[in-house]
A protein has these predicted regions:
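N-terminal short beta-loop-beta anion/metal-coordinating cradle
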Residues: 1-57
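Solvent-exposed, acidic/flexible segments
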Residues: 3-6, 49-52, 137-141, 190-191, ...
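Proline-aspartate-enriched helix->loop->beta-strand connector
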Residues: 64-66
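A C-terminal functional module that forms or caps the active site or interfaces directly
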Residues: 168-210, 218-219
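His/Asp/Glu-rich mid-to-C-terminal helical/loop segments that flank catalytic regions of hydrolases
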Residues: 218-250
Length: 250
């Protein structure tokens, strides 16, 4: 299964399916077809963490994929990365799961003082759990990561690097906050879906991998380019073809 949140992140791949068939489940679109004769589903998850989780749960229960690739566009956190560069997510993190310090009225707020909160650390209250103060990492499936690395020389519109994908229902434009995330949690990019989809895929024990292209990077004045979403899908198509070829060998 290949996931993309917006039409510009999903429709190009769907158009490359052999014998495509579109299906609507609730608010989510799915395209069924084949790549090199192997069944592939493309999912338009819609934007945000809740939508990504729901679409992933639907996919896992309805289609039983052998693997899920969540891909699309992202904003840069690393000044060394340029628009059209692709990040292979060695892991993803939820940048929306934090606990604030106790402050009285008038003391203000500084998000750089917030503690990460691992909602999966226990079944009790995450706010009271002393062991929950870490940012959970959702690792890439090593086989999917290796296959993506094997075809990166085919991508000519930028470089392809391993990195950390940060996800949250937040659009960060404060450079100090972005630098804090990059320095503290090694985030390469930010978007709104990967960590959520990764969390649900892990619950269903489905191999998962996130691939993101930089559509903008305000840390180095990289201007937004919506065409990056098409470039990412073209690269992911090559990853899927290589993954299918590997499956057929075994």
């Amino acid at each position: 299964m290949v996931q993309g949140a917006m039409p510009v992140e999903a429709e190009r791949f769907a158009q490359r399916l052999e014998n495509p068939r579109e299906e609507q489940i609730g608010g989510w679109r799915f395209w069924h077809g084949t790549v090199d004769g192997y069944p592939v589903v493309v999912s338009e998850t819609l934007k945000g963490m809740s939508n990504a989780a729901a679409a992933t749960a639907i996919a896992a229960t309805q289609f039983h994929p052998v693997a899920i690739i969540n891909q699309g566009t992202a904003g840069g956190h690393d000044p060394a990365l340029k628009v059209y560069d692709i990040v292979l997510g060695k892991y993803s993190v939820n940048l929306g799961a934090f606990k604030t310090p106790a402050k009285t009225l008038g003391e203000g707020s500084d998000s750089r003082q917030w503690q990460p909160m691992d909602l999966l650390a226990s079944k009790g209250s995450a706010g009271e759990d002393k062991k929950a103060h870490s940012l959970r990492q959702f690792p890439a499936d090593p086989n999917l990561l290796a296959i993506a690395q094997s075809v990166k020389s085919d991508y000519r519109q930028g470089k392809v690097v391993e990195g950390v994908i940060g996800s949250a229902d937040v659009w960060n434009s404060e450079l100090d906050r972005i630098r804090y995330f990059h320095d503290s949690y090694q985030t390469s990019i930010e978007e709104m879906e990967t960590a959520s989809a990764a969390q649900i895929a892990a619950e269903f024990k489905v191999p998962f991998f996130g691939i993101r292209v930089l559509s903008n990077n305000i840390t180095n004045q990289g201007k937004y380019d919506p065409q990056t979403g098409l470039a990412c899908q073209d690269y992911v198509y090559q990853v899927v073809k290589a993954y299918i070829a590997n499956l057929k060998k075994h």
